[in-house]
Regions:
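Active-site HxH/HxHxD metal-binding segment of metal-dependent hydrolases
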Residues: 1-86, 114, 175-177
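Aromatic/hydrophobic pocket-lining residues that form the small-molecule binding cavity
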Residues: 4, 145, 226
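A structural signal for the main folded, soluble domain(s) of proteins
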Residues: 10, 14-17, 78, 90, ...
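Feature marks short, surface-exposed loop/turn motifs that line or immediately flank catalytic pockets
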Residues: 26, 123-125, 170, 209, ...
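Metallo-beta-lactamase
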Residues: 59-75, 92-187
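Short, acidic/polar N-cap/turn motifs at the starts of alpha helices
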Residues: 82-85, 105, 238
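Short polar/acidic secondary-structure junctions
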Residues: 85, 98-100, 244
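C-terminal regulatory/interaction regions
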Residues: 189-264
């Protein structure tokens, strides 16, 4: 999509090679190989286990079928890894790898000029989408996301960030702190919501976290985000879950975590 949708056009138009991390290249190839005419079995299972009503699931699948995404035609690439240094014109750029939002999101940092091409990994006002997906339903992307924020904090104070959405900004450390606080608030909100309901599906938790969703595209993103937060709380021992006889996963707060003050 907006990560690599123009890769083929740029490489063909300018006669240049594609530089990319391995994880992003493989993800691009995998998404490009999937057909959108029929939902994949793993997608059907993912939504069924979430408890989302079937008519709402069908609207999500229909939105995916209508998606105009055309996968890049890329069979070769040059691999970027964390710590690599690229010399582009007068500047040297260090490769920083971010995870959570995308498998191996490449950021470029020029320490000498205090410049960070942050992409989707660090945005000035909105928060990057961090979600569990149907092809990795047991994933815990928020743990990877927080580790990536730690790496971004190594950038010097006063670094100018060039994000992929909205305006350029300064204040890497302050923004990282805001993002951590945002997710901490969501963890606390989810813990109380699940405790109040007793047994809670991911869909019910989604409606509690995001009560004003508009359309199937937002349902898709919000459900993935909700499951990511539920998975993180499971890893921390705050929640447990069970696949019940109706094929739906339901979450409970672990008894010892009901009234405990949490330190995220």
């Amino acid at each position: 999509y907006d990560h690599a949708g123009l890769a083929s056009w740029m490489t063909e138009r300018f006669g240049v090679p594609l530089y990319m991390s391995l994880g992003e290249f493989l993800m691009m190839r995998m998404l490009g190989s999937q057909t959108r005419s029929v939902p994949q079995p793993e997608e059907q299972h993912f939504y069924a286990r979430s408890g989302m009503p079937q008519d709402r699931v069908e609207r999500v699948f229909e939105a995916l079928r209508q998606d105009p995404f055309v996968p890049p035609r890329q069979d070769q690439f040059r691999r970027l890894r964390a710590g690599d240094v690229l010399t582009i014109g007068p500047r040297r750029w260090q490769v920083l790898i971010g995870e959570g939002h995308s498998p191996e999101h490449v950021c470029l940092y020029s320490a000498e000029d205090r410049l960070l091409i942050g992409g989707d990994q660090l945005l000035p006002r909105i928060t990057s989408n961090v979600m569990v997906t149907a092809f990795e339903p047991e994933g815990n992307p928020l743990t990877l996301w927080f580790e990536s924020l730690d790496r971004l904090e190594t950038c010097a104070e006063g670094t100018l960030v060039l994000p992929s959405h909205q305006n350029v900004f300064r204040g890497v450390h302050a923004r990282v702190g805001q993002l951590r606080e945002h997710h901490q608030q969501q963890f606390e909100q989810l813990r109380h919501l699940v405790a109040e309901r007793g047994r809670c599906t991911a869909f019910e938790a989604m409606l509690g976290l995001y009560p004003r969703l508009r359309g199937p595209e937002q349902d898709l993103l919000a459900l993935g985000e909700t499951v990511a937060h539920l998975s993180w709380l499971r890893q921390r021992g705050v929640l447990d879950c069970q696949l019940e006889a109706d094929g739906i996963i339901r979450y409970n707060v672990v008894q010892s975590a009901i009234d405990e003050e949490m330190h995220w």
